[in-house]
From Swiss-Prot:
Pfam families: Semialdhyde_dh, Semialdhyde_dhC_1. This is N-acetyl-gamma-glutamyl-phosphate reductase. Its EC number is 1.2.1.38. One of its GO terms (cellular component) is cytoplasm. Pathway: Amino-acid biosynthesis; L-arginine biosynthesis; N(2)-acetyl-L-ornithine from L-glutamate: step 3/4. SMART domains: Semialdhyde_dh (SM00859). Belongs to the NAGSA dehydrogenase family. Type 2 subfamily. The gene is argC. CDD domains: AGPR_2_C (cd23935), AGPR_2_N (cd17896).
């Protein structure tokens, strides 16, 4: 049986990317709502209920409305908004998070696709907290830079409309109340919200997230090699992982660490740097904010859910 897939919000940034990734596939049938009917709740309900799997690429409130329009027990959902990421009954769509997560996604009725900003720090921190190398109440700070596509259509139009006058970068989220904090705290196994400082750069897509660690106040200070080993061991045990861990090495800089390096892929590459004498470490993730951070993750989750249908 060919699975029917409906992308609710297929004309937005993430929706367009998902459709492009699925366009040549013959194992699925893509349902497409006429443009003039895409904001009609009755039309959306028709397509949502006809789908085997619906992928929601909508703002939070619109995503909640779409879920409410599903009137059967068979349509499964992948939601790319923040609406359900820490909600009971929704599997978190980061298959590499735990050995059992791929199976949980494959069997789930409802899957919450991860946000681009939390996914890198979660990938870096969760193995360390699970291994007991970092306490859950460790004061975590997260820095990073993303392409302007991370702000959706309005930011894309604003940046590209300014041409040469567009800023090279700018910080945002200066109220320190980023919408991804609950998700980050929950899945990184943290006991408190981290301090998160995102930056937008003058490039379309790709991102780097960084977690600096001041380790000197811990009762037992882990060495850099220990941090790296815990992260590497975690992902070595995940079948089909899209997360790579770079070798542990002492380098001043690397041409690999470039935000656009993994654009149009679903790859995330993790790095650990350390100065043991100073009891400091830097954790770093490089990935595509529209790939592993959005559409690539959605397709990865879709494939897992399809495996549960076969």
């Amino acid at each position: 049986m060919t699975a029917k897939i409906f992308i609710d919000g297929e004309h937005g940034t993430t929706g367009l990317q998902i459709r492009a990734r699925l366009g040549e596939r013959r194992d699925i049938e893509l349902l497409s709502i006429p443009v003039e009917r895409r904001k009609d709740p009755a039309a959306r309900a028709e397509f949502l209920n006809a789908a085997d799997i619906a992928i929601l690429c909508l703002p939070d409130d619109a995503a909640r409305e779409s879920v409410s329009l599903i009137a059967n027990d068979t349509t499964r959902v992948i939601d790319a908004s923040t609406a359900y990421r820490v909600s009971e009954g929704w599997a978190y769509g980061f298959p590499e998070m735990d050995k059992s997560q791929s199976k949980a996604i494959a069997q789930a009725k409802r899957v919450a696709n991860p946000g681009c900003w939390p996914q890198g720090p979660i990938a870096l921190l969760r193995p360390l907290v699970s291994a007991g190398l970092l306490p859950a109440d460790f004061p975590v700070t997260i820095n990073g830079i993303t392409g302007y596509s991370g702000g959706g259509r309005s930011m894309i139009e604003d940046y590209e409309g300014k041409g040469e006058d567009a800023p090279e970068f700018f910080p945002y989220g200066l109220t320190l109340s980023h919408k991804h904090l609950p998700e980050l705290r929950t899945y990184a196994k943290l006991a408190r919200d981290p301090l998160m400082q995102p930056v937008v750069g003058n490039f379309a897509q790709g991102m780097i997230t960084m977690v600096p660690l001041q380790l000197g106040h811990l009762p037992r200070v882990p060495k850099g090699e220990e941090l790296h080993a815990a992260i590497a061991d975690h992902y070595a045990g995940i079948e089909g992982s899209a997360v790579e861990v770079a070798p542990f090495q002492a380098i001043e800089r690397s041409p690999e660490i470039e935000p656009e390096r993994y654009n149009d892929t679903n790859t995330m590459r993790l790095y650990v740097f350390a100065n043991d004498a100073r009891a400091q470490a830097l954790l770093l993730a490089v990935y595509d904010n529209l790939g592993k951070g959005a559409s690539g993750a959605a397709v990865q989750n879709l494939d897992l859910m399809l495996s549960g249908l076969r």
